[in-house]
């Protein structure tokens, strides 16, 4: 800021800029001085402190002044300092200096940069110049300033970055890349973009054209791991082995314990060791041959115990597999993939490709690479009533094997027998043909625990007094099996399914069954009939039935049982037809009176009896059963369970008449019950009144006795109160007198005890005070005696220690010294005084010497 003062005092190490307004030239005035401003001059700013650069610091001045060889400032013809415009000057530690007009402090005082060990500065030349060694440096050149040291900045050089050394530890390597053609630290020539590893342990400072990519850690290898590598290009590894581009190989712990992947190596992964136990084997696909190449399409079987690494390109077929250990009940079905021979010596057997054979245990078997294990077979244990279906694959013939443990041969397979869906459903149902025969539909359906094994022989347990028909479609014949029996189906046999009617009234095909119950049993049906007078009725009839079979060994007779598929429906229809025909010829009243006889004769029919009528003719009588000759079904009895009108009006009228009869009967019973209840109520009321009168008389007697007792009690009470009051007053006076006497006696005793206690206390206090005083006096006397002894002993020991000569010298030392001092002065003095001022001549010598009366100099306070 310009100042208008005429006199400017410039302190030391300060300066100002003065502008000559006539010539427009500025100059510098440096203190210490007092500057007188001229009229044509102008001071541009107040005194400013000079620029001081301390040691190990620097600053940058823009547009610096030009200097000659003697470092003197150059001026032009006008007297203005000559500047190097657009230039810079780096000034280090020196004496304080001013800034000339036009100079600018571009960078303030800054400490010099200290480059530490393992550190370097990346420098780049901005201009062409010659260094201090005389070497030419071209613009764009780059180099490093490595520590330790202090970097002196130059205006032609730019600091690009600070480079830190990278510490390489054990099992590590530094990956570098060349930014341009250069020589590495080992003096090896590198081309642009080339990468390499530095494996030496310690701090590594990359060169100026070396770029650090990353720090590569070594892969630690053990006995159980290997490193899978692939070559990125043709190169030789550290062991001198040449690798081609794309080649893959393994590095194991036998090669090195820790492997640092090279720049030309690509790590594909860590391969674990494959360990086979004594009961294991594996099949290696595309195994590696002696030439180090994979044999594509080949296989190699390796059996344990063994440990190995899978080479690149190798893979396991189905992993590690267990050796087949076969027992006596086990076998292996094998298939030859290639021609081979098995066995030794005379037992050697040749197999062609595609052959199948079976080997049986007990043995251990490891299949070769030319053999495929089709399946492992187990002997199928079969009980006496169990079996399987076996088919010969060569002939196609199917047979059933029942009752013994069986193992399939190489040409046999299990055959699945298919059954109709209806038969499957009936076999899977859990209801008993006998116990569940009365249930509707398929109630009590039990879900099977598992699906039926179709290779097992189909068997069915025929219950007691039942029959099952099995039909052989190949032989075209049927056989009937009677229960209790277990029937098993041959491969070509099927069950005959019965489709029976069920329900009320009977519905066809409502129930299906595999077995035919032979009875005796019953079934119920509902039929509608019409009488001669057109009354429609609904009957519910139950029939007892059974099958009559004379010879079960006769095939023709047994086949008749299944000749009628629905014997229930056919029998019910036939019987209903007979009943309708019989009822249609009688009126309702006749049928109502003789319904059982009419129905029985209609069902069973009638025959001539031996009894004769009035006219001598034989009388008809009802048979006791009805026989169906087609299948031998016998109906032995019939039960009429209900008869109901079908017409609604008739049914309502019948119900009303029944209700009216019931109501009349109910009303009569109600009236009789009501009359009986009234009679019983009258009797109870009379008994109650009589009991009340008796209770009142008893209460009056009790009241009389109570009043007498109250009067007696009041008399006794008045007499007792007066007597008790007098006795209590006399007793109170007596007790009060005795208490006064006792109180006076106790007070006298207490006063005597109190007086004696006080006297005893005072006596003991006086005795204790006397003892205390005597002990205190004795202690004082003892103390005084001991102090006197101590003083005497002290004085005695002091005199003995000083000795008689020393004591005498101390006694005469003062006077002798005074005499000698006066003699040494040689003064003769005259003393004139009057009698009113007595003078102590004994202390005169002390006063002259400046001593006190005791011969000691005065103490300075």
Curated annotation (Swiss-Prot):
Record-level GO cellular component terms: cytoskeleton; cytosol; nucleus; perinuclear region of cytoplasm; ribonucleoprotein complex
Annotated Pfam families: MVP_shoulder (PF11978), Vault (PF01505), Vault_2 (PF17794), Vault_3 (PF17795), Vault_4 (PF17796)
Modified residues (N-acetylalanine): 2
MVP repeats: 2-56, 57-111, 112-164, 165-217, 218-272, 273-323, 324-379, 380-457, 458-520
Residues with the Phosphoserine modification: 421
Free-text description of this protein's post-translational modifications in UniProt: Phosphorylated on Tyr residues after EGF stimulation.
Domain characteristics, as noted in the entry: MVP 3 mediates interaction with PTEN.
Function: Required for normal vault structure. Vaults are multi-subunit structures that may act as scaffolds for proteins involved in signal transduction. Vaults may also play a role in nucleo-cytoplasmic transport. Down-regulates IFNG-mediated STAT1 signaling and subsequent activation of JAK. Down-regulates SRC activity and signaling through MAP kinases.
Protein name, as recorded: Major vault protein
Provenance organism: Mus musculus
Gene name of the record: Mvp
């Amino acid at each position: 800021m310009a100042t208008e003062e005429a006199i400017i005092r410039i302190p030391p190490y300060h300066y100002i800029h003065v502008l000559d307004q006539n010539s427009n030239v500025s100059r510098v005035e440096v203190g210490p001085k007092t500057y007188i401003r001229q009229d044509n001059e102008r001071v541009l700013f107040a005194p400013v402190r000079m620029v001081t650069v301390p040691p190990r610091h620097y600053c940058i001045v823009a547009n610096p002044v030009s200097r000659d060889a003697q470092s003197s400032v150059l001026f032009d013809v006008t007297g203005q300092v000559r500047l190097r415009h657009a230039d810079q000057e780096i000034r280090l530690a020196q004496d304080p200096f001013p800034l000339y007009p036009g100079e600018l402090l571009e960078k303030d005082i800054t400490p010099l940069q200290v480059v530490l060990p393992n550190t370097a500065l990346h420098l780049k030349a901005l201009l062409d110049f010659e260094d201090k060694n005389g070497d030419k440096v071209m613009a764009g050149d780059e180099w490093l300033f490595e520590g330790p040291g202090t970097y002196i900045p130059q205006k032609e050089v730019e600091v690009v970055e600070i480079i830190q050394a990278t510490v390489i530890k054990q099992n590590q390597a530094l990956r570098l890349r060349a930014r341009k053609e250069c020589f590495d630290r080992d003096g090896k020539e590198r081309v642009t973009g080339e990468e390499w590893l530095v494996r030496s342990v310690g701090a590594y400072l990359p060169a100026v054209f070396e770029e650090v990519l990353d720090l590569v850690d070594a892969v630690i290898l053990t006995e159980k791991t290997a490193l899978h590598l692939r070559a990125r290009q043709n190169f030789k590894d550290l062991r001198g082995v040449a690798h081609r581009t794309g080649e893959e190989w393994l590095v194991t712990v036998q090669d090195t314990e820790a492997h640092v992947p090279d720049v030309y190596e690509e790590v594909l992964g860590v391969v674990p060791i494959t360990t086979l136990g004594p009961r294991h084997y594996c099949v290696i696909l595309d195994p590696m041959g002696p030439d180090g190449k994979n044999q594509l399409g080949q296989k190699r079987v390796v059996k344990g115990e063994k440990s190995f690494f899978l080479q690149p390109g190798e893979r396991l077929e189905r992993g590690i597999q267990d050796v087949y250990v076969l027992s006596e009940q086990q076998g292996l079905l094998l298939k030859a993939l290639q021609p081979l021979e098995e066995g030794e010596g005379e037992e050697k057997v040749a197999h062609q490709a595609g052959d199948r054979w079976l080997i049986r245990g007990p043995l251990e078997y490891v299949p070769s690479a030319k053999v495929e294990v089709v399946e492992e077979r187990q002997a199928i244990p079969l009980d006496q009533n169990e079996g399987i279906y076996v088919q010969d694959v060569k002939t196609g013939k199917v047979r059933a094997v029942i009752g013994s443990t069986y193992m399939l041969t190489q040409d046999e397979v299990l055959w699945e027998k298919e059954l109709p869906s209806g038969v499957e459903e009936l076999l899977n149902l859990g209801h008993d043909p006998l116990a569940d025969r009365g249930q509707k539909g398929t109630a009590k359906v039990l879900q099977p625990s598992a699906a039926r094994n179709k290779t097992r022989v189909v068997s069915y347990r025929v219950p007691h007094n039942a029959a099952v028909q099995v039909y052989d479609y190949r032989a075209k014949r049927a056989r009937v099996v009677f229960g209790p029996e277990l029937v098993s189906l041959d491969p070509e046999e099927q069950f005959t399914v019965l489709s029976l009617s069920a329900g009320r009234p009977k519905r066809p095909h409502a129930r299906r069954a595999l077995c035919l119950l032979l009875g005796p049993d019953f079934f119920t049906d509902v039929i509608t009939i019409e009488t001669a007078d057109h009354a429609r009725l609904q009957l519910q009839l139950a029939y007892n039935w059974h099958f009559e079979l004379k010879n079960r060994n006769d095939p023709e007779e047994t086949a008749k049982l299944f000749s009628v598929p629905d014997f229930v429906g056919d029998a019910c229809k036939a019987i209903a037809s007979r009943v309708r025909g019989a009822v249609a010829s009688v009126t309702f009243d006749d049928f109502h009176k003789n319904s059982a006889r009419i129905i029985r004769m209609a069902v069973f029919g009638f025959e001539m009896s031996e009894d004769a009528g009035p006219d001598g003719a034989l009388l008809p009588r009802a048979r006791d059963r009805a026989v169906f000759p087609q299948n031998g079904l016998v109906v032995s009895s019939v039960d009429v369970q209900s008869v109901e009108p079908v017409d609604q009006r008739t049914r309502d009228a019948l119900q009303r008449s029944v209700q009216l009869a019931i109501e009349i009967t109910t009303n009569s019973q109600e009236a009789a019950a009501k009359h009986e209840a009234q009679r019983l109520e009258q009797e109870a009321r009379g008994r109650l009144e009589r009991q009340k009168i008796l209770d009142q008389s008893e209460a009056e007697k009790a009241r009389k006795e109570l009043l007498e007792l109250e009067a007696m009690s009041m008399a006794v009470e008045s007499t007792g109160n007066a007597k008790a009051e007098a006795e209590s007053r006399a007793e109170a006076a007596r007790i009060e007198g005795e208490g006064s006497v006792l109180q006076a006696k106790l007070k006298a005793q207490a006063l005597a005890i109190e007086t004696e206690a006080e006297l005893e206390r005072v006596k003991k206090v006086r005795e204790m005070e006397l003892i205390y005083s005597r002990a205190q006096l004795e202690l004082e006397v003892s103390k005084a005696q001991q102090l006197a002894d101590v003083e005497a002993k002290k004085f005695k020991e002091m005199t003995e220690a000083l000795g008689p000569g020393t004591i005498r010298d101390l006694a005469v030392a003062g006077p002798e010294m005074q005499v000698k001092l006066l003699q040494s002065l040689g003064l003769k003095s005259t003393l004139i005084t009057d009698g009113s001022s007595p003078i102590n001549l004994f202390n005169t010598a002390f006063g002259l010497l400046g001593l006190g009366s005791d011969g000691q100099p005065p103490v300075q306070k």
